[in-house]
Amino acid sequence: MTACFATWQKGRQKLRVANAGQSQPLLYKDGRCGKIDLAGFPLGIFEEVSYDEWGVTLAPGDILVFHSDGIAETANSEGQFFGTERLRKLIEQHHEIGAKEMSDLILREVDWFTQSAPLSDDRTLVILKVR
């Protein structure tokens, strides 16, 4: 099983993240969106394992996007993947909208890209936008 665990310290605007085999979260900060270089083994594979923790201080307008691989690895009828790059560009182009609106937009774009083909994997998004 994969998981991503995050804690948010509101007063300090500090986010800490650990990843257990989930897709790398995306961070929009200072006008650019990129992957958080954080990986780890899925839960339950090894009896004893430790996970790296990544931390950042966020500012108003910063956006963090947790997503399952069912977003980037969704394929269209030609076998092309939606891809992390397309997801990253959507976030950069629409960074001014709210988290709910961004989630709806991304899922609509994935549906349009796949031409509403049946789901082959889950499509999970959690979006945090700092106010």
Language model regions located:
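Conserved subregion of the PPM/PP2C metallophosphatase catalytic domain
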Residues: 1-131
